[in-house]
Amino acid sequence: MTYSRNIFIPLTRACRNRCGYCTFRSDTPEPPLLEPEDVMGEVRRALSLGCTEALFTFGEDAHEFPGVRDKLESLGFGDMTDYTYHLCELTLDAGLLPHTNMGVIGYRELRMLKEVNASMGLMLESASPRLMETEAHRESPGKNPRLRIKMIEDAGRLRIPFTTGLLIGIGETIEERAESLLELRRIQDRYGHIQEIIIQNFRSKPGIPMENQREPSLLEMVKMVAAAKIMFPDVSIQVPPNLNRETGEIFLLAGADDWGGVSPISRDYVNPEAPWPEIDELKRITESAGFALEERLPVYRKFISREFLSPRVMERIEELYPRFIETL
């Protein structure tokens, strides 16, 4: 059972999507954008606590918001991709390995960011276009599954180690859940770059449009984890531990083999009501189910090679984290 010791750095809460289950986005984020000195202060703090991963997550097409655009221009950047590249570059030089999830972006942006990222990510959430007509995604053009599937495929063409996953309980049917797994299996069979699939349960929060939506049951989640593991024996299956503190052991027995990024320094800004468990607590939960807990990097060991990583990232891993490299 693995985990990555990380810091979560939300560069901005501005986002073009208005998902019915989200508390992260803001029309007027304050500050509109984290500045480099703030980011690097967090990076240095993370390094002092033994973190290896910097998770850069922020709203999709954030540079379309006037406040963000003005701040980018004042810093000398044209858009969020250019700015993220710069921050990833600084972070990599400092000794943390970047993992970026900035919503749907194109092939050119992916190719650019691969140079300074150990891995990247985008949740598929669901392959069902029907959800675009529901409260979950009615006001979220970036949640169109066609766009998200294309980005995951583009990452495969570029040989980027990739994390994706499904969001369970946002109005999808059992059949649509199965179709979503089959879509990811099709992509993986063609490109082989998916390192991890997250099976994440919807959690109701006060004040969101979907506040009264029923959360998925434990049995539903167990079935999804088991189905994912059967369909993806070559991919790690993650269940977020902070969203399932009381039931974590059950998911291990169902086939989950990764806890994802766990931070000793930052909260989960997407689910602020659910703090990360301490590493010692994760160890206890894991061992109580009969498994050992092992730390990993944001790129899984089998993807640590020049086939999947840029020379720049590979050299940093060889220099700083040789113990994580697969030895033959």
UniProtKB/Swiss-Prot annotation:
It is an enzyme of class 4 (lyase). Its EC number is 4.3.1.32. The keyword Acyltransferase does not apply. It comes from the Archaea. The keyword 4Fe-4S applies. Catalyzes the radical-mediated synthesis of 7,8-didemethyl-8-hydroxy-5-deazariboflavin from 5-amino-5-(4-hydroxybenzyl)-6-(D-ribitylimino)-5,6-dihydrouracil. This is 7,8-didemethyl-8-hydroxy-5-deazariboflavin synthase. The lineage of its organism: Archaea, Methanobacteriati, Methanobacteriota, Methanomada group, Methanobacteria.
